[in-house]
Amino acid sequence: MAFNVADLFEHTADAVPERTALICGEDRRSYAQLDERSTRLAHTLADQGIVPGDHVGIYALNSIQWIEAVLAITKIRAVPVNVNYRYVEEELRYLFDNADLKGLFYGEEFGPRVAAVKDTLPLLKTLVMIEDGAGENQADLDPILFEDAVAKGSPVRDFPKRSGDDQVIIYTGGTTGMPKGVMWRSEDIFFALMGGVDPFTREPVKSEFEQSEKAKASAGQLVFMTPPPLMHGAAFVASLMNLFQGNVNVLVRKFEPEEIWRLIERHKVNSLLIVGDAMARPLIETLEALEARGEKLDLSSFLSLSSSAAVFSPAVKERFLDRFPNLVITDSIGATESGFNGLVTVSKENLGNKAGGPRVTPGKDTVVLDENLRPVEPGSGVVGKVARGGNIPLGYYKDPEKTAQTWVTAADGKRYAMPGDFAMVEADGTITLLGRGSVCINTGGEKVYPEEVEQALKAHPAVFDAVVVGVPDERWGQKVAAVVEFRPGCDATLEELREHSRAHIAGYKLPRELHVVDRIERSPSGKPDYPWAKTLAESGNYRVAVSP
């Protein structure tokens, strides 16, 4: 039995055709509409010469058309490839070439960038433009308009039989280097990231029809909202998971905190997905400000908050629980290269350590391996790397060297994905995440993981956001430098921040430099821009105005 992305969606569309699948602004689709439109679009792609195995990119802001494009690509067994809409021309040229794109869906506003690089990409033949009224004349590109592509395609689902081996490629920038394409088999990504395994019970789905049959048997639908960019893994996989399960998925084009709360009220959203503090802090502070002004929003439908892919500080979790005492908060760890690695349900009594990453129950097939690729003993205090076996990616596209570094064969003979996240195994078997090794600071032989220092700093009432990096030091090799964004009207000295943090982390981990900025640079997914912070810290500037 094959678990294929397109098949799983079609099963749900057949089971609950009239139910709402997607909402974005005033645009919405039922499952039947979404299926027919993506089927038509798939036929148009095939008519343009896209064949099974061809790579087709999606370069656009969040929209229903983004999801329709993914479904269309997978329906004809081609390979969807995400494109970061923040990339400049040089980065786009690299990604389009590295990914061997044969086709591209792009938002109208990004047309000029596509035009600037297309002539150097002989493989890229098929262009489909998602119209949004934000672009310039596209005559030099001669794209097919998205709605024309839908209109001209056949609505008949007469596609060749699909396979669990059909691929999805997710490009990830990580914390360093050029973007790398992670190759997932359809079946593997379903079980690792798209709901194929229950994160609480660890029980896998046994039939490709199991989720669609449950959706048909249910009396109603859950309403999920996924504000992060679809171009990143978290929102992309969550959106498809919701479709497989027959839920309503609410998308937003851009992250605007006040609009998020108003949409939660309007659509009676039950569950919200965020990416750590970069989204959580603005959300809770905006809500607090709205309510302080006397605004009364009906948020009674809001039942759960899920965070992944970035640090979600205990202090911020506590503010959500102060406002929503019965809110179920889950904090999970994982990576594009490995899939879901673990989860913790947060409560007032279990907010997490103010220094260090989340402490989670490991997911199915997740272990921590030591330097000899053997499992770390619980409670030993040994720092190892998080690794995941089972349903994991094939590797990086066209990069065998980095593939060999990230996917390893351990002492037990099993193949594991090991992206580089350091962790310890506690006595009870839970995992405490310490941070990514590529940004680890070595000061006098002691290892300092930026995330634990960042969490300690962000627990200070004056600090809105912080990124920590290592800078050269004649005596210690490296010293800890903090780049900090204060709350409006607030300030603190380096000594005040050190004194506050001393209660949470060891003395050698305390920052020895403070660089104050008016805005911390982060990716749209909420991840810290460590190269930016390191360049800033090494510049010697201690008060820096960051342009919007």
What do these predicted ranges mean?
Residues 192-227, 231-273, 286, 290-293:
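Conserved AMP-binding/adenylation subdomain of ANL enzymes
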Residues 1-3, 135-166:
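Flexible, low-complexity linker/hinge segments
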Residues 18-63, 67, 71, 88-93, ...:
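Conserved AMP-binding/adenylate-forming core of the ANL superfamily
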Residues 30-32, 167-195, 199-203:
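Conserved AMP-binding A3 loop
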Residues 47-48, 75-150, 515:
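Structural core segment of the AMP-binding/adenylate-forming
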Residues 17, 153-171, 178, 213-223:
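Conserved pre-ATP/AMP-binding loop-to-beta segment of ANL
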